[in-house]
Every structure is written in C-alpha cells, then in structure tokens.
Amino acid sequence: MTTNRLVLSGTVCKVPIRKVSPAGIPHCQFVLEHRSQQQEAGLSRQAWCRMPVIASGQLLQVLTHSITVGSRLTVSGFISCHQGRNGLNKLVLHAEQIELIDSGD
C-alpha cells in the first residue's frame, strides 16, 4: 500500500519555528490543535489531538509567513515518524497544502 494522506483543520497552538536547512531549504514547524465532534458506531464523540506540522520549501513559506498562534488552518499532506531528542517517536504531518480559514472578522 502506498496511500498516505491526512487532512486536518485546527488552530496553531505553539509559536511557529522557522529554519533554513544546510541545503538552503526553508522549513516552518508548528503545532496544530484539532477539536471536533465525530460520529462513531452511531454515537457522537469528541475528537481532539495536537499534531506537529512541518512545511518545507519556498512555495509554502509564502503561506506560513503570516501564521501565528491562534491562526485557523486546514493542512493537507502526508504523515511520517520523527524521532525526538528524547528518543521517542512521534507522528508529524508534512504539509503539502495549507489553507487559512477565514475567522469572519
């Protein structure tokens, strides 16, 4: 199987970290908090998660430049496992597309 696709909407809950790799590729890392009501087995349940997101490359940097804590986004991309400094593995969403959700203000 080769399908690896995730679409998640939420609110940026940690200050974005912007870096440039030694190869000159810009990266923006942030955490997206998702909260929703979902249906499962005919019952309503609360869904909640915090997903680390990394957006790489020049095209996405134009979009991520305006992202701050509290920004509402829909992010689509693929997930991959990253090992943290503490040695624990975590899932990370590698953004391929980012859409700002209009707050209606």
From Swiss-Prot:
GO terms for cellular component: primosome complex. Keywords: DNA replication, DNA-binding, Primosome. CDD domains: SSB_OBF. Residues 1-102 form the SSB domain. It holds the Pfam family SSB_1. GO terms for biological process: DNA replication, synthesis of primer. This is Replication restart protein PriB. It comes from Photorhabdus laumondii subsp. laumondii (strain DSM 15139 / CIP 105565 / TT01) (Photorhabdus luminescens subsp. laumondii). Involved in the restart of stalled replication forks, which reloads the replicative helicase on sites other than the origin of replication; the PriA-PriB pathway is the major replication restart pathway. During primosome assembly it facilitates complex formation between PriA and DnaT on DNA; stabilizes PriA on DNA. Stimulates the DNA unwinding activity of PriA helicase. NCBIfam families: PriB_gamma (TIGR04418). InterPro entries: NA-bd_OB-fold, Primosome_PriB/ssb, Prisomal_replication_PriB. GO terms for molecular function: single-stranded DNA binding. Belongs to the PriB family. Homodimer. Interacts with PriA and DnaT. Component of the replication restart primosome. Primosome assembly occurs via a 'hand-off' mechanism. PriA binds to replication forks, subsequently PriB then DnaT bind; DnaT then displaces ssDNA to generate the helicase loading substrate.
